[in-house]
């Protein structure tokens, strides 16, 4: 991924509510809203209202659909991310201090994302290689990283409560 031509986005949580904005400068690219005690969520990207559903108990899948039409736009199954009609990629850790990202069939990452979680807010950044639509992939990356941060916080709380 070329740093000069890639699109750099910010993941912002403007309030304590579980709502995030993905911005490129002042332009709003996508929005994400996640419930605290349930999986799934809602969002908007590229002018479409989206719904994120989680399916399965042992092998969890996350499915992104158009809220109005029910059309499936993307599916995350394990580490495999399938963007319908666009491409498939693998969601993986890119190494220490590099965050996580979507890696194409050639082994090159075309999306890189990192989040920081504080006591009340989670923020971060997403970088997408030139030539890729930033809206839906950045929303999926933000969703996966925020859920991962939630799971880590819950595990830490359980460890503290057990001692």
Q: Predicted segment positions?
A:
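Intrinsically disordered, low-complexity proline/glycine-rich segments
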Residues: 1-163
